[in-house]
A protein has these predicted regions:
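Structured-RNA-binding interfaces characteristic of tRNA pseudouridine synthases
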Residues: 36-197
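Short hydrophobic targeting helices and cationic amphipathic motifs
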Residues: 5, 9-12, 24, 28, ...
């Protein structure tokens, strides 16, 4: 929690500095102002995480963040860093993961940019659903109001084909009555920190 607070304070300080810079530059179109100006964009991402080592960039292995960062950097011809709303683990899929990046050059045609990006990413089972220009007060992680996680159990003897790698296959019949009773114990404010990997 302290780590998250420090990140947030750092981010808030950055926003303050940007606003100060904005006020120092009386003409936002001047060369001085343009050299400080960064354009921020939010993207919504859908992906199948089966062949990835999760969201976050790692030294070894293919990650969602790493691949998208690399493709955006190539298209814009500048190094960018992608910030995600959350860090999903290995093999986890996403329907609408929010992320943002900053770049020096304004993207003139957003739909063309997404089309070019998806040309490469779709082969990797990643799709950019939407892109939107955002203000500097937006942050994919700290501006997120909610996160929804879905866990799928496929309870039958035969192996799933369509839902392969998209759910937990359990052969033995589950006792839903006991499961519902146990689920009630999870409702409310709880500390599940001991269950972390």
């Amino acid at each position: 929690e302290v780590k998250n607070l420090l990140k947030f304070l750092k981010y808030r300080e950055r926003v303050k500095r940007f606003k100060k810079l904005e006020s120092l530059c009386s003409d936002p179109k001047s060369e001085k102002a343009q050299s400080y100006l960064m354009f921020r964009y939010q993207i919504l991402i859908e992906y199948v995480g089966t062949d990835f080592r999760g969201w976050q960039v790692q030294t070894k292995g293919k990650t969602i963040q790493g691949l998208i960062q690399e493709r955006i950097s190539k298209l814009l011809k500048e190094k960018i860093i992608l910030f995600g709303a959350g860090r999903l683990d290995k093999g986890v899929h996403a329907l609408e993961q929010s992320a943002h990046f900053e770049c020096k050059k304004k993207i003139e045609n957003l739909s063309k940019f997404v089309k070019s990006l998806n040309h490469f990413l779709n082969k990797e089972m990643i799709s950019i659903i939407k892109i939107k220009k955002r203000g500097n007060d937006f942050h994919a992680r700290f501006s997120a109001r909610m996160r929804i996680y879905k866990y799928k159990i496929i309870n039958r003897p035969s192996r799933p084909v369509i839902d392969k790698n998209r759910g937990w296959h359990i052969i033995n019949k589950l006792d839903l009555k006991i499961m519902k009773k146990a689920a009630k114990k999870l409702v409310g404010t709880k500390d599940f920190s001991t269950f972390r990997a």
